[in-house]
Amino acid sequence: MEFICRHDRTAEVCRAAVEEDGWQLENVPEEMKTPELCRKALETEAGFGNDFHRGLVQHIPFVEVCMEVLKECRENNPEELYGVAVAIRPEVMNGEMADFLLPLDGRCISILPVHLQTPERVRVAVETSGMSAVGRGGVPKSLLTPDVYVSCAAHSRESLMMIPWAERSPEVCLMAKTLYPDIVKNHPEFVPESVRNQDSIYTLN
């Protein structure tokens, strides 16, 4: 359909195209797209057994359809959820999607538009995925408070070890000593010298 003159891409032509090949949705003019047409494209590709049909969300401008795809993905292929979320257009992503995604995969915090990144959502993200949620960048430093790193420490051993050196505060180190005493014992270098040598919540406990 990409070789058809834009003027000739009527609703009928577009529907026939996506019924034959769901990925033709990419060539449908934005003003011709409807929720029904987008669902038809998804249905076509799913019918072919195409495991990547959810990637069509990159061509879907409707919140409700993208949300349907996310819910279906959660039920049938939860391991693909992050990849599908990445493909959703930033202007389509909204608070409802953010609050759906973060308890399932905290890494999604880094792909949210900045206006959707809030302290509460960062909290949920690190409770879900620890440092994996915020260690890849994409989250404003102003939201990465000391409490966020304490939550990362509490998440898991793996998350604890990913905490940047500069963020290993007395509170983080105390959490490590409390939850994973063997790490602190066997890897004393985990605790910065500045924390070991000062009177703090870490040294006084």
Residue ranges and their predicted role:
Residues 1-205:
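Non-catalytic tandem-repeat scaffold regions and their flanking low-complexity/translocation tails
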